[in-house]
Amino acid sequence: MQYPEPIAQLIDGYMKLPGIGQKSATRLAFFTIDMAEDDVTAFSKALIAAKRDLHFCSICGNITEGDPCSICADKTRDQTHVLVVEQPKDIMVMEKMKEYHGLYHVLHGVMSPIEGKGPEDLNIASLINRLQQNPNIKEVIIATNATPEGEATAMYLSRLIKPAGIKVTRLAHGLSVGSDIEYADEMTLFKAVEGRTEM
Amino acid sequence: MQYPEPIAQLIDGYMKLPGIGQKSATRLAFFTIDMAEDDVTAFSKALIAAKRDLHFCSICGNITEGDPCSICADKTRDQTHVLVVEQPKDIMVMEKMKEYHGLYHVLHGVMSPIEGKGPEDLNIASLINRLQQNPNIKEVIIATNATPEGEATAMYLSRLIKPAGIKVTRLAHGLSVGSDIEYADEMTLFKAVEGRTEM
């Protein structure tokens, strides 16, 4: 016996999401059938709306409804700093911190030889272009993830930007605040020692 | 900074699903934005369709597009056995086994004093009614889960149905096929010894 067509379709839909296999998708599909109709309708509309109404900011690559995005359009922000991140969601994380008031640039990925992703597949050309056209940008802070790909991308960007006389910095590596040295991995510990600061 | 409204709405939508919190929902929402438009549209429509086109079978309580469901409507199936399950998805599991050819009845839950769920909240009245109107039903196989609530519900049903002279059976408990005795819990092992069969 097959699942009724509407369930089978819904299971297929859920299975398109990352980390959701046949079993989870089936569970979610049956849960959906028990959900309030309003919630399902709202969810369904939100899916379409997110796809239809959101675009990438033509300046920084952030996800936005308008263009440019609210950060690029905000002239009260520090126009001398550009923080480079891998994904739009990283901007949200930085903004939650409330301590950075400069601009952003989203690469939409990192260089990854394994996935065949080179610099030309990333939002790098527009960053270089942006730096050339805005001489008031004094520092580029690279905030790619602390993965091998993130490090390689940071290194590549640094070599590309430094010759133009712009300061390039990288987020510090070290122990998480509140964490035990005992549980830190060797690489993090090494970075923490290497980057030790005077008290 | 807040997420753009369409993303916030989509995150809300995902958070309505079981086991998906703020972080997972955010990840899924951003993933959705990168999905192919066709896939998102299909998913969105499937949500609405599943809610709109599916109903419970008026006879057995299974989820179905038509009424009665394809199993109740299939007169070639063994009309003398009714297998009682907690949820519609349990029917799919049984059907995959391909060894049971009788009918089903879905309780839509189990008795649970903690959740304040009594017999009157389950699809039990219609089961009794069905047994009374179909004298050709000779055996009711109770296949609720092997949880305390499932056991209690099985016991309750057994006491309710037996006096009518209908045979009531329960799925066997025991070791999983291919499993090691070493890893079986005491309760399962006890049930396996208790239910031992002659060779």
From Swiss-Prot, chains A, B:
Belongs to the RecR family. It comes from the Bacteria. One of its GO terms (molecular function) is zinc ion binding. This is Recombination protein RecR. The gene is recR. The keyword Metal-binding applies. GO terms for biological process: DNA recombination; DNA repair. Keywords: DNA damage, DNA recombination, DNA repair, Metal-binding, Zinc, Zinc-finger. Residues 80-176 form the Toprim domain. Transmembrane segments: none annotated. SUPFAM superfamilies: Recombination protein RecR (SSF111304). A zinc finger (C4-type) spans 57-72. May play a role in DNA repair. It seems to be involved in an RecBC-independent recombinational process of DNA repair. It may act with RecF and RecO. The keyword DNA-binding does not apply.
